[in-house]
């Protein structure tokens, strides 16, 4: 597994490759990581090998780095504050990020996403554990649960962690 250390407000350090820093130029990123898997948009590069996406501001400088494979990495092992953010559970990750954020948190999305405004860290998942548990209860009442219980159980397992984590430049989530 490729070890990647995430440092909010600074950037990432990819073991045996080097650092991608917030504010670094697109050309510097291309020199370090090579050609991307996909030019996701005019100002976005997707590197599937490193399981991440890098967004650039209008000046061509790194403004956001997002890890997109969540708790199902194929090649990477992440470290944020010396902990893998995708293996500790959503509640523990929120507590950890809150402790290091030391300020305002945008939690207006009903537990689906959180933006830690001081540390410029964001996390996202498709649904919460509560959402899935309510869906299971309704499916059991309607008789639909028994037709595909493994799908519901998979969703329940997936709801226990966030699926993406991103870091941005200072003030990224205040823009």
Region locations from a protein language model:
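Short helix/turn-capping signatures at newly exposed starts of structured segments
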Residues: 1-175
